[in-house]
Amino acid sequence: MKTLTFISLMTTSVACLGSCTNPAASDAQQPWIVDRFDDIKVIRYEVPGFERLPLEQKELIYYLAEAAKCGRDILFDQNCAANLPIRRTLETLYLNYKGDRTSDEWKALEKYLKKVWFANGIHHHYSNDKFRPEFSESFFREAAASVGMDRFPADFDFLCKVIFDPAIYPTRLNQAAGADMLWTSASNYYSNVRQHEAEQFYAAMAAADAGDPCPVSYGLNSQLVKEEKTGRLYERTWKVGGMYSPAIERIVYWLEKARDVAAEPQKQTLAALIDYYRTGDLKQFDRYNILWLQDTVSNVDFVNGFIETYGDPLGYKASWEANVNFVDSAACRRTRIISENAQWFEDHSPVDPAYKKKVVKGVSAKVITVAMLGGDCYPATPIGINLPNADWIRKEHGSKSVTIDNITYAYDRAAHGNGFEEEFMLRPEDRERIDKYGKIGDDLHTDLHECLGHGSGQLAPGVKGDELKSYGSTLEETRADLFGLYYLGDPKLVELGLVPSFDVAKAQYASYILNGMMTQLARIEPGKNVEESHMRNRKLIAE
């Protein structure tokens, strides 16, 4: 699971690592917000501490970072089958158009391309609605003709229909009650499959393994396809030699280089991930996850694979993502205290004892500096991560939580002095409290959300965790947020030295309610539903 903030983020390459020792030193020299379009703010982030790492760790980060960049096209295709040809068509136009680049139509096309880049496709990354082009179809066709139609796909006419006809692929993820969520969603996790067919397919898999105490995450790394003529259902597995093989082969190439320079136990973890990518075997994925979460000593760490299921309305299929990071040792004090006291928090949570863990195992948490992001972590970036997602692994082996400090710092700097608080917070004492404690409140809530929220509790016997379908992700994020919000106001945090007073909780409560009830809705067109799981979660709690 991951935590997303209410400010979208596009990451940029770090041009000068030498200036990254102290982020505050560069605040006055360069803007944190480098571009704006529609509801998007493009924010620069820095990677402090990279230059102080040993050479072998820098080399490891480089190889892992290259692997993180190789899965971009996977995510585009997962989000919608038309995404890649549309993106490539737009990029060809952008690079080769010789006409007037100052015209309103061209500027509208440029903005549309930026939105496609940012959202990894033609649908908004939060609302899931298809983008409406502000340039005309006639201009688009004339621009393409001026470049030369031989440069564009043979199905150019169909791509025009996808871009300009609002009835084609109208939403990436439809979770409306009563709708066939697969048939009406543009995402590419299922091909020619109805919702009831997919549910029956995976229910049969689960029933066949009903006695397995360590069930795999059925369907996690595959597209489910229905043959037109025979009606047969089968999976196209995402692996070397399977679907997305060219991209996965490049990922494996760089992971093998990383494995060769990594030290144990990380060398073994990388080997397990490579085996999984080669075989597509979900048992191998579980083995990799256990090795990964048990490694609490490596300074450099990573996430790479098909991880989160937010994009699948049924909660089976995972989008591809990557994250390369290293430990921010100075900021790890609070996460160390939280993880060391995980049993106390579990025991004192306001939850039915039947759903509490008797013994909390393997809870680890740290603050990290992210060095590279890819796939579904880019460019709208999480600020916290808690993995793995498999319930039986979390129960038997624990979980690993991280808070991404250089990203939260960039958010804070970009928001500082923008006039928002003065406009929407009427009481001076609220503004003063949030200015003083807002950053620590945000960071601590993320720590509590990831380490204790997602890491807490256990399912009832016989419950697999996918029964809630489209509601599952939202309610899990709600559970984790409520856990964090509840403990922010507990005197235990003062006792542990994590907060100076209850004012930290007051600051977080005020900003959370404001965000859930109003701020985040700036992304949603009037009359549209809130679809993204984290946004739904905040709205549910705040209202």
Question: Where on the chain are the PLM-derived regions?
Answer:
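Short alpha-helix carrying the canonical HExxH Zn2+-binding catalytic motif
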Residues: 439-452
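An active-site-proximal "capping" alpha-helix that borders the catalytic cofactor pocket
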Residues: 54, 263-264, 473-490
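N-terminal-proximal low-complexity accessory segments that begin disordered
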Residues: 27-89
